[in-house]
UniProtKB/Swiss-Prot annotation:
The lineage of its organism: Eukaryota, Metazoa, Chordata, Craniata, Vertebrata. It catalyses: a ribonucleoside 5'-triphosphate + H2O = a ribonucleoside 5'-phosphate + diphosphate + H(+); ATP + H2O = AMP + diphosphate + H(+); CTP + H2O = CMP + diphosphate + H(+); GTP + H2O = GMP + diphosphate + H(+). Disulfide bonds join C54-C71, C58-C89, C69-C82, C75-C81, C98-C115, C103-C133, C113-C126, C119-C125, C144-C190, C152-C364, C380-C477, C428-C817, C561-C622, C574-C678, C576-C663, C786-C796. Residues 31-874 are extracellular. GO terms for biological process: ATP metabolic process; basophil activation involved in immune response; negative regulation of inflammatory response; negative regulation of mast cell activation involved in immune response; negative regulation of mast cell proliferation; nucleoside triphosphate catabolic process; phosphate ion homeostasis; pyrimidine nucleotide metabolic process. Residues 50-93, 94-138 form the SMB domain. InterPro entries: Alkaline_phosphatase_core_sf, DNA/RNA_non-sp_Endonuclease_sf, Endo_G_ENPP1-like_dom, ENPP1-3/EXOG-like_nuc-like, His-Me_finger_sf, Phosphodiest/P_Trfase, Somatomedin_B-like_dom_sf, Somatomedin_B_dom. It comes from Bos taurus (Bovine). The chain crosses the membrane at residues 12-30. Belongs to the nucleotide pyrophosphatase/phosphodiesterase family. This is Ectonucleotide pyrophosphatase/phosphodiesterase family member 3.
Length: 874
């Protein structure tokens, strides 16, 4: 019997020995197979060399140089084709690139492109002919320094402009996968690029492509979604129907028409709207959309257009590819499918650049590479079902990341559908609800998504990666999608540019895609049609700007409402328990009578960038000076248009102290007929008065009286005042601490028709029924600080930083579901949702800011078009 010791030591040794022998045998077997294959390959090559090759002999009927094989048309039928016939004579005609085997090939008429010795002369070379067959350095391998000098061949008086869109290329892809997209990364390195391009809302394909080429928001150009209904047309638009080819849907003027109207020629190889007779006109050269056309064919055709004679050659080109959007939808943004798609579009872009280099056009063409939107992951367990909120669903819903709800019964019930009830029934229903319902006029102004009959009244803003759908029958989930709030990082798109007009090796701040249209017009040296962009705001991308902006001209001049009498002729129903005698009143009223030195001092401190100019006609505003704030008063509206003041960095972030209670008095500088009455209220609407400039923001106990006056009153809903007061007493202190002081300009907004522009006086009067004081639709706040936070706002010598808000003035705070919550849990978030650009504030108020800031206007426009974002997660 074996011992235990033998079992535990000898048996493993035997097993290891056997294992070694097995490995050695396998290795020897592999070597034997390899040697056999090598011998066979050598024998085969010798046989092939003896037999002959089809190189330069494709479809030649003669037998010269061929032994035992043929390369003519009939060789397949006879079975005597040379060994390389298929590769050389058949497959080479089906690819769009050269290789060493194709170089010097016999010209074949069936080839997609040629690598023959005469292809340059015949202008049908494959795009990479010179780099593959003539040994030139490929574009992607060239150093940026070799492409610095602008140069155009003879006949190119105006540098051509190419607009290239890669659908769904989110900005993060280029950061994460830069090594997998060498051609695109080369463009980024050598040219100018933004951190990202902000799409318009909804972040969908058709709305954003048309925004890019018109400079208009979707609400302005009419393509508000990929799917929509128009009550006036009584028709539905979708990407799968022929109705999308109806010009009635396409409003505004796309860049190809702008160029053609001004004598230029254009060529479009796919772009939403380019195969539609918009305004009765097609582009000079265009292709009807067909997604089956290979990307290589699209590039080759565009390059052939560049080869046309000067009289026929387009000046402007568009080209579009569907990836990486398609793979993003199929597999999600973080997937092998997207990586493969990125490599495909990079190879496609590389072909374009090789073709341009081959034509000596790399430093002649201005090329913009961008995307329409980004992409986010979706999950089938992240769906909000309307069936969970309604016992029965008797409405129609556009489902997904940008949902809208309307009546089923169209057109009969389109205008009578109770949208308000739908929003009420969807508001604050669950503690973990993943969407917020809005009536379109109440949506954040930064979205510019309200003023179009095609925009349904009920809109849901959905959390990232979630979708809102009708019921559990919905199955479009689990891959990727887009359409979300355009502030989400996952929706950010790419923007890169290169060419003789663009700066090199430059990164710029993000900007909105509405600005691209004006940029294209500048590159083409043409006048843009009216649009939502801010012309000149992208001048910093260009070496030599074509257009130099100037400040808007003031249309209504401010006078000064001066101090004339120390006591009011009419108390306007005001009273103050602390000011019982006329001498008390006179004492505080005398504080309103500033000397010229005091006016100069308050202007320097509280209007450090100059007072806002009024770009409204037929107004009679006046300036009201105080030591701690300055306001521009509108006598017709009986309220300030704006108030401006500077909050210094505080010693701590404690909330501001309360002010004297129940204390108001008439402003003696404003006529009673032009003032609000202290007793003004609309009890049925729960409206009372609030203060535009916060009285608690006082440096001395007496200075609060400068704010407790009728000229500082604005009408406010009680619920809104809760939020307004918290902002000024808590958040403003916090911002001043973080930014080393802030300048604040705030005021009312009147946009009853929700078109994003200030209402004319007669429009305001139409809505101000049964009240002498019109009720604002929104209030704005613009916070300005110094980007260099070692400097205060009133002493800032460099760039400014801005944080603007446009807050809907609503009777409730249901948007934030504040019940049983302290203001600290919802007010700041509410303000952040309603951030805006300074330019949005200007359009809504008719004001123009920063006219006295010592800085080029184009740089001021960069500031005005900046949109603060608070999203950090992708």
């Amino acid at each position: 019997m074996q011992s235990t010791l033998n079992l535990s030591t000898e048996e493993p040794v035997k097993r290891n020995t056997v294992k070694k022998y097995k490995i050695i045998c396998i290795v020897l077997l592999i070597l034997l197979v390899a040697v056999s294959l090598a011998l066979g390959l050598v024998a085969g090559l010798r046989q092939q060399e003896e037999q002959g090759s089809c190189r330069k002999k494709c479809f030649d009927a003669s037998h010269r140089g061929l032994e035992g094989c043929r390369c003519d048309v009939g060789c397949k039928g006879r079975g005597d084709c040379c060994w390389d016939f298929e590769d050389t004579c058949v497959q080479s005609t089906q690819i769009w690139t050269c290789n060493k085997f194709r170089c010097g090939e016999t010209r074949l008429e069936s080839s997609l492109c040629s690598c023959s010795d005469d292809c340059l002369q015949r202008k049908d070379c494959c795009a990479d002919y010179k780099s593959v067959c003539q040994g030139e350095t490929s574009w992607v391998d060239e150093d940026c320094s070799t492409a610095q000098q602008p140069q155009c061949p003879e006949g190119f008086d105006l540098p051509p402009v190419i607009l290239f869109s890669m659908d769904g290329f989110r900005a993060e892809y280029l950061q994460t996968w830069s090594t997998l997209v060498p051609n695109i990364n080369k463009l980024k390195t050598c040219g100018v690029h933004s951190q990202y391009l902000r799409p318009a809302y909804p972040t969908k394909t058709f709305p954003n492509h048309y925004t890019i080429v018109t400079g208009l928001y979707p609400e302005s150009h009419g393509i508000i979604d990929n799917n929509m209904y128009d009550i006036n047309l009584n028709k539905n638009f979708s990407l799968s129907s022929k109705e999308k080819d109806n010009p009635a849907w396409w409003q505004g003027q796309p860049i190809w028409l702008t160029a053609m109207y001004q004598g230029l020629k254009v060529g479009t190889y796919f772009w939403p709207g380019s195969d539609v007779a918009i305004n009765g006109t097609f582009p000079s050269i265009y292709k009807i959309y067909n997604r089956s056309v290979t990307y290589e064919e699209r590039i080759f055709t565009l390059l052939k257009w560049l080869d046309l004679p000067k009289a026929e050659r387009p000046d402007f080109y568009t080209i579009y590819v569907e990836e990486p959007d398609s793979q993003g939808h199929n597999y999600g943004p973080v997937s092998a499918g997207v990586i493969q798609a990125l490599q495909l579009v990079d190879k496609t872009f590389g072909l374009l650049m090789e073709g341009l280099k081959q034509r000596n056009l790399v430093n002649c063409v201005n090329i913009i590479l961008l995307a329409d939107h980004g992409m986010d992951q979706t999950y089938c367990d992240k769906l909000e079902y309307m069936a969970d909120y309604f016992s029965s669903i008797n409405f129609y819903m556009f489902e997904g990341p940008a949902p809208r709800i309307r009546t089923r019964n169209i057109p009969q019930d389109f205008f009578t559908f109770n949208s308000e009830e739908i929003v009420r029934n969807l508001s604050c229903r669950k503690p973990d609800q993943h969407f917020k319902p809005y009536l379109s006029p109440d949506l954040p102004k930064r979205l510019h998504f309200a003023k179009n009959v095609r925009i349904d009244k009920v809109n849901l803003l959905v959390d990232r990666q979630w979708q809102a759908v009708r019921n559990r029958a919905y199955s479009y989930c689990g891959g990727g999608n887009h359409g979300y709030d355009n502030e989400f990082k996952s929706m950010e798109a790419i923007f890169l540019a290169h060419g003789p007009s663009f700066k090199q090796k430059t990164e710029v701040e993000p900007f909105d895609n509405i600005e691209v249209y004006n940029l294209l017009c500048d590159l083409l040296h043409i006048q843009p049609a009216p649009n939502n962009g801010t012309h000149g705001s992208l001048n910093h991308l260009l070496k030599v700007p074509f257009y130099e902006p100037s400040h808007a001209e003031e249309l209504s001049k401010f006078s000064v409402c001066g101090f004339t009498v120390p006591l009011p002729t009419d108390t306007l129903g005001c009273s103050c328990s602390r000011l019982q005698t006329n001498s008390d009143l006179e004492r505080v009223n005398q504080m309103l009578d500033l000397t010229q030195d005091e006016i100069t001092a308050t202007e320097k401190l509280n209007l450090p960038f100059g007072r806002p100019r009024l770009i409204q006609k037929n107004k009679e505003p006046c300036l009201l000076y105080h030591r701690e704030y300055v306001s521009g008063f509108d006598k017709t509206l009986r309220m300030p248009l704006w108030s401006s003041y500077t909050v210094p960095k505080p010693g701590d972030t404690s909330p501001l102290p309360p002010t004297v209670p129940d204390c108001l008095r008439a402003d003696v500088r404003v006529a009673p007929s032009e003032s609000q009455n202290c007793s003004f209220s609309l009890a049925d609407k729960n409206i009372t008065h609030g203060f535009l400039y916060p009285p608690a923001n006082n440096r001395t106990s007496n200075s609060q009286y400068d704010a407790l006056i009728t000229s500082n009153l604005v009408p406010m809903y009680e619920a809104f005042k809760t939020m307004w007061n918290y902002f000024h007493s808590v958040l403003l202190v916090k911002y001043a601490m973080e930014r080393n002081g802030v300048n604040v300009v705030s005021g009312p907004v009147f946009d009853y028709d929700y078109d994003g522009h200030f209402d004319a006086p007669d429009e305001i009067a139409d809505y101000a029924v049964n009240t002498s004081v019109p009720i604002p639709t929104h209030y704005f706040v613009v916070l300005t600080s110094c980007k260099n936070q070692s400097q205060t706002p009133d002493a800032c010598t460099g760039w400014l930083d801005v944080l603007p808000f446009v807050i809907p003035h609503r009777p409730t705070n249901v948007e934030s579901c504040p019940e049983n919550k302290s203001e600290s849990l919802w007010v700041e978030e509410r303000f952040n949702v309603h951030t805006a650009r300074v330019r949005d504030v200007e359009l809504l108020t008719g004001l123009d800011f920063y006219q006295e800031k010592a800085q080029p206007v184009s740089e001021i426009l960069q500031l005005k078009t900046y949109l603060p974002v608070f999203e950090t997660v992708i």
